[in-house]
């Protein structure tokens, strides 16, 4: 297990040795708290877009189901007749220049795995740039839009936001409740009180602290050809290699177990780069991966490589709440 994986496991298990990192945690908390305070006071300038900006992010390190929720929000807004754009940091991407408009036929190392997935699934206009404010300006200059979804960027306060949605893994929660590097929190836990909504991935019902949503498997898709198959394509008890280069690989492996398959788990670092050699496992079995990983593997995929398509399913209460927020944000003065 890599050091980063061991540290992540310790954060969520509450390992006592992490107490040694508390002096560094105190320094980190001071830095992030002061940074946010400067923007709140107006000492540091924020860019406010002429259209509503909705930030979808988290305050923890590790996967929370953010990309599937972004996909749900895009489709839901489109059903209201809205033109939606997305901005993203483009973690791991190496574009020719910044900001960079992501197209569906671009290589993953140029566009970034998550932005490429979003564009391939939805065709939404999407701009990547670590400077989210600059990305929003470039996106609005390229075409008229009704609102912007910011993929992550909770801590990027140079971009003013009209709505904040924070996602949390329902099973792992906030881990030991400590900030980096003594815990998984990017900001102190009380930051949640300032968000407009908290969504718990893996909760089928709403909680006092926020709304629930689940990731529902919908199909198997062949990585090489794009052919879709029903989930019963593999019989119960099917052994298969399971690949996950995401923030919380175990959640993916548990999903496969819940489908009555027998996965041989192969966890990779989040945003890992793959090759045919790195995915050559023994014994020869079908291989199932996440959709985020699949966008990086199509060029060398074997015939029996598949990805599991999943759809975010928030509770009806969140859908109703979000519709009310859209009406408020888009109300003409």
From Swiss-Prot:
Keywords: ATP-binding, Kinase, Lipid A biosynthesis, Lipid biosynthesis, Lipid metabolism, Nucleotide-binding, Transferase. Pathway: Glycolipid biosynthesis; lipid IV(A) biosynthesis; lipid IV(A) from (3R)-3-hydroxytetradecanoyl-[acyl-carrier-protein] and UDP-N-acetyl-alpha-D-glucosamine: step 6/6. Its EC number is 2.7.1.130. ATP binds at residues 60-67. SUPFAM superfamilies: P-loop containing nucleoside triphosphate hydrolases. It catalyses: a lipid A disaccharide + ATP = a lipid IVA + ADP + H(+). It comes from the Bacteria. GO terms for biological process: lipid A biosynthetic process; lipopolysaccharide core region biosynthetic process. InterPro entries: LpxK (IPR003758), P-loop_NTPase (IPR027417). One of its GO terms (molecular function) is tetraacyldisaccharide 4'-kinase activity. Pfam families: LpxK. GO terms for cellular component: plasma membrane. Signal peptide: none annotated. Transfers the gamma-phosphate of ATP to the 4'-position of a tetraacyldisaccharide 1-phosphate intermediate (termed DS-1-P) to form tetraacyldisaccharide 1,4'-bis-phosphate (lipid IVA). NCBIfam families: lpxK. Belongs to the LpxK family. This is Tetraacyldisaccharide 4'-kinase. It comes from Pseudomonas putida (strain ATCC 700007 / DSM 6899 / JCM 31910 / BCRC 17059 / LMG 24140 / F1).
């Amino acid at each position: 297990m890599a050091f980063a994986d061991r540290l992540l496991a310790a954060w969520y298990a509450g390992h006592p040795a992490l107490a040694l990192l508390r002096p560094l945690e105190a320094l980190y908390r001071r830095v992030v708290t002061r940074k946010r305070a400067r923007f709140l006071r107006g000492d540091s300038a924020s860019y406010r877009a002429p259209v509503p900006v909705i930030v979808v992010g988290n305050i923890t390190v590790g996967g929370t189901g953010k990309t599937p929720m972004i996909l749900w929000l895009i489709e839901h807004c489109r059903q209201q007749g809205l033109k939606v754009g997305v901005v993203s940091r483009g973690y791991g991407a190496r574009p020719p220049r910044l900001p960079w408009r992501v197209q569906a036929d671009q290589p993953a190392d140029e566009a970034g795995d998550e932005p490429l997935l979003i564009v391939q699934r939805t065709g939404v206009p999407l701009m990547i740039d670590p400077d989210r404010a600059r990305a929003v300006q470039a996106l609005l200059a390229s075409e008229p839009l009704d609102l912007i979804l910011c993929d992550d960027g909770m801590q990027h306060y140079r971009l003013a936001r009209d709505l904040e949605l924070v996602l949390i893994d329902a099973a792992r929660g906030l881990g030991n409740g400590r900030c980096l590097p003594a815990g998984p929190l990017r900001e102190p836990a009380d930051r949640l009180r300032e968000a407009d909504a908290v969504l718990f991935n893996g909760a089928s019902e709403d909680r006092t602290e926020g709304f629930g949503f689940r990731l529902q498997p919908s199909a198997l898709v062949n990585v090489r050809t794009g052919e879709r198959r029903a989930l019963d394509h593999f019989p119960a008890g099917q052994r298969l290699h399971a690949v996950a280069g995401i923030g919380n690989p175990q959640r993916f492996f548990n999903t496969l177990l819940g489908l009555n398959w027998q996965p041989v788990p192969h966890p990779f670092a989040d945003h890992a780069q793959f090759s045919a050699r790195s995915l050559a496992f023994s014994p020869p079995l079908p291989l199932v991966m996440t959709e985020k990983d699949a966008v990086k593997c199509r060029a060398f995929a074997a015939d029996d490589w598949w990805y599991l398509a999943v759809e975010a399913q928030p509770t009806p209460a969140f859908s109703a709440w979000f519709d009310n927020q859209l009406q408020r944000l888009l109300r003409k003065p």
